[in-house]
């Protein structure tokens, strides 16, 4: 399962699926039936509807939001504190509690059209691993550890289920909580 995708063809250089395929999926003995890519080529709305249906059909729902509950989700964090394609202050952060997958029309990072899992799905995961490397992520990691705010979407993840793996350059100064 993927957390987000750019609305491009799967073979496009901007495709998260292509990146994952080249770095991992094509190199490991993974059954293709176990890989569920977001269909960015369908566009934001149709791609989100398609993926929401596929995810809901394969993964049991639960929790307060009634959304599919993934065992583990692995996310990166952007320099602005975004996770998946949930950007600071974006409307997608306030999607209804039962939302599974959302179309994004106006990403501040190119390309502007994307598909993303909702915050409800990210928060419902049994465990979340967040990766951050490099000095450009230090402010975002520090913001993630502060008070929850839609200005730093990563701060909205459930901390009791979150494991952050950061290198020295991305680690904020002082003790971590």
Regions found by a protein language model. Name each.
Residues 6, 77-82, 135-136, 170:
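Short glycine-rich anion-binding loops that position phosphate/pyrophosphate groups of nucleotides
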Residues 16-22, 88-97, 146:
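A glycine- and small-aliphatic-rich helix-loop capping segment at beta-alpha/alpha-beta transitions
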Residues 120, 124-177:
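ATP/nucleoside-binding phosphotransfer catalytic cores, i.e., glycine-rich phosphate-binding loops
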């Amino acid at each position: 399962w993927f957390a987000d995708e750019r609305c491009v063809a799967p073979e496009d250089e901007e495709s998260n699926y292509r990146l994952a395929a080249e770095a991992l999926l094509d190199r490991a003995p993974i059954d293709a039936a176990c890989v569920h890519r977001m269909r960015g080529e369908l566009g934001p709305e149709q791609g989100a509807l398609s993926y929401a249906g596929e995810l809901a059909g394969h993964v049991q729902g639960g929790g307060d939001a009634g959304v599919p509950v993934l065992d583990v989700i692995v996310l990166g964090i952007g320099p602005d504190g975004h996770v998946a394609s949930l950007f600071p202050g974006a409307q997608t952060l306030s999607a209804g509690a039962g939302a599974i997958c959302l179309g994004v029309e106006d990403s501040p990072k190119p390309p502007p059209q994307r598909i993303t899992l909702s915050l409800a799905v990210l928060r419902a995961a049994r465990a979340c691993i967040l990766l951050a490397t490099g000095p450009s992520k230090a402010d975002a990691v520090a913001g993630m550890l502060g008070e929850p705010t839609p200005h730093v979407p990563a701060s909205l993840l459930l901390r009791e289920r979150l494991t952050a793996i950061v290198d020295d350059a991305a680690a904020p100064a002082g003790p971590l909580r």
